[in-house]
Design a protein with these regions (language model features):
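Terminal amphipathic helices with adjacent charged low-complexity linkers/tails
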Residues: 1-2, 58-89
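Non-heme iron-sulfur electron-transfer modules
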Residues: 1-13
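Conserved thiamine diphosphate
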Residues: 15-20, 24-28, 84-98, 103-119, ...
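N-terminal amphipathic, basic-rich helices that act as targeting or association modules
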Residues: 17, 23-55, 59-66
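Short alpha-helical segments and helix-capping/turn motifs at coil-helix boundaries
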Residues: 33-44, 160-161, 185-191
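Generic, well-ordered alpha-helical scaffold segments in large soluble proteins
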Residues: 35, 40, 44, 48, ...
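Thiamine diphosphate
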Residues: 61-62, 161-241
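N-terminal leader/propeptide and maturation segments of large enzyme subunits in energy/redox metabolism
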Residues: 86-161
């Protein structure tokens, strides 16, 4: 297995497909092109992924009670998913990012204190590695595992204080999912606001060029001349750039 991983890096198209998908058996419409994109993203970032999902097809095949296609790996890590209103999903996802960043900043201060003033060398070494990779998602996960193990072995009061929020120690990959009806039309102002922030956040637009979940009505993403509901004679305006 390790030989394959070394030969085909996960940062390549082929190499990414040797990673476990953390989205499976979605129940989407036959031939739907949306789940494969989400599956690929979970292969790359799923074990540390937060998803803010705009109401639409992605919330129907993505988390219709009582089941969900999002799953966890053998370590129990997988995407954390939540659904928002159609009109404010970008802001909702941005809020998720700011909230977990605030918690991590608090944890960072505590780890810095342990590294500077602690007496347990294992905790200090693991803490320094965690601090060095604080903003690097690809390597911070492994550093977090080492830090958690060292803190659990230590058992001191400061360690227990940090471990109380251990789920927030690892650097997260924040994603915002939604369709073109959300991103081009109803939630466009929020998308613009979030992208303009320059923060470390990702937006995935499932652009079907119509309002898919409500039956195929035209959106600002629909191309000129396309026939859709509310555009039976062909859409008169061009696709929003």
């Amino acid at each position: 297995k390790q030989d394959v991983i070394d030969k085909f890096k996960e940062t390549t198209v082929k190499g990414s497909q040797f990673k476990q998908p953390l989205l499976e058996f979605s129940g989407a419409c036959a031939g739907c092109g949306e789940p494969p994109y989400a599956k690929l993203i979970t292969q790359l970032f799923g074990d540390r992924m937060y998803i803010a999902n705009a109401t639409g097809c992605t919330s129907i095949w993505g988390n219709s009670s009582p089941s969900t296609p999002y799953t966890a790996n053998k370590a129990g890590k997988g995407p954390a998913w939540s659904n928002s209103l159609f009109e404010d999903n970008a802001e909702f996802g941005y809020g998720m990012l700011l909230a977990q960043r605030a918690i991590r900043d608090g944890l960072k201060a505590k780890v810095e204190d342990v590294v500077a003033n602690g007496t347990n060398e294992d905790v200090k070494a693991a803490g320094q590695e965690w601090l060095d990779t604080f903003a690097v998602g690809a390597t911070n996960g492994a550093a977090t595992d080492k830090l958690v193990a060292a803190l659990e072995a230590c058992g001191c009061d400061k360690a227990k204080e940090i471990l109380a929020q251990k789920d927030f120690l690892a650097k997260k990959s924040q994603w915002i999912f939604g369709g073109d009806g959300w991103a081009y039309d109803i939630g466009f102002g929020g998308v613009d606001h979030v992208l303009a922030s320059g923060k470390d956040i990702n937006v995935m637009v499932f652009d079907t060029e119509v309002y898919s979940n409500t039956g195929g009505q035209s959106s600002k993403s629909t191309k000129t001349g396309a026939i859709a509901q509310f555009a039976a004679g062909g859409k008169e305006t061009k696709k929003k750039d």
